[in-house]
A protein has these predicted regions:
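Short alpha-helix capping/helix-loop boundary micro-motifs
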Residues: 72-84
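Short, compact, well-ordered microdomains
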Residues: 84-112
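Acidic, low-complexity intrinsically disordered regions
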Residues: 43, 79, 103-104
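N-terminal non-globular leader segments, chiefly Sec-dependent signal peptides
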Residues: 1-73
Length: 112
């Protein structure tokens, strides 16, 4: 497995190492980056929470959970509510094998 380090810095945020996504070594990098994007987006749950999560006392299955995602930055708890991380967006980046790839409007671009 190859480790893809995900950093959020879009929207003027400070660079934050938010997660690592582990993907099989034989997956081409550009294809793997698309997997990283999907696995760090909130579509039907919260990618940064476990296999289930609770909202107002009700437990839900988390379709966005993946055992291949390691959340690096702890989740925010405010007023007793645990908030998941935001989705990966344009301006965020991933580092793999020492190369930085910026999340672009469409796809990924290797940093110069």
């Amino acid at each position: 497995m190859k480790k893809y380090e995900v950093y959020h810095n879009a929207f003027g945020d400070q660079d934050v190492h938010i997660a690592n996504v582990n993907i099989a070594d034989d997956v081409p990098v550009m294809e793997a980056l698309e997997v990283v994007f999907r696995k760090t987006n909130n579509i039907e749950g919260s990618w940064s929470k476990g296999p289930t999560f609770e909202v107002k006392g009700e437990t839900f299955d988390n379709s966005d959970y993946s055992e291949n995602v390691e959340v690096v930055k702890p989740l925010l708890v405010k007023d007793g509510v645990e908030w998941g991380h935001r989705s990966t967006s344009v301006g965020d980046y991933v580092i793999v094998d020492g190369t930085k790839y910026n999340c672009a409007s469409v796809g990924w671009e290797a940093a110069a």
